[in-house]
Amino acid sequence: MKTQAEPTAQDFMHRDVHTVPSDMPLVDIVEFLLKHELSNVPVVQMDGDKPLLRGFVSEADCLEALASEMFYGMPIPPQTAETVMKKHPTCVSPETDIFALTSIFTSHRYRHVPVVNGQVLLGIVSRRDVLKALDEFYREWIRDRNREKFRVDLHKIVNHRFLVTQ
C-alpha cells in the first residue's frame, strides 16, 4: 500500500512571523503582543536580511516580569526582551516530521515552536497548525486504508468469466 509522505514543518509553517528586537522594552513587548493578538513572539537580531533567533518571549514571561516589577519595584537595568526571553527555546528544523512535532507539543505543552535553519528563523509552527496537518494526514491515511481494504481483485473478475463448471 502506497501512502503519502509524512508532512514536515516546512509544509505548514508560517513564514511571515512577527518578531521583536532584543532591546525592545518590556512594556512595548506587552503592547506588541496585545496589538497583534499573539501569545508569544520570537526575539531576533538581524544579520543583514537574515533574522537570527536569540530567544522567545511568551505572555507568561511578560506576566511574571510585569508583576515582579510592580511588586518589587523598578529593576535596574530596565527589562527588555533580552532580560525576559527564554534564551534557548525549543526549535525544530524545516524537515521535522509531524509525529516529532506532535510529541513536542504534547510533551511540553507549547503553543508555538520556531522553525530554524541553524540560527536563522525561517518560520513558526503552532499547535493548531500541527493538529490541522495531522487531521489532513489522518484522513488521507484512512482513505488509503479503505482503498486497500476494499480493493477489487481484477484477476478474480476476469477469471470468473472463464470458470468451467462440470
Language model regions located:
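Tandem CBS (Bateman) regulatory domains
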Residues: 1-15, 58-91, 97-106, 126-166
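A glycine-centered beta-loop-beta connector
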Residues: 33-36, 41-61, 105, 113-129
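Short N-terminal helix-initiation segments at or just after the protein's N-terminus
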Residues: 1-5, 21-35, 53-61
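The conserved cystathionine-beta-synthase
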Residues: 20-38, 43-45, 91-109, 116
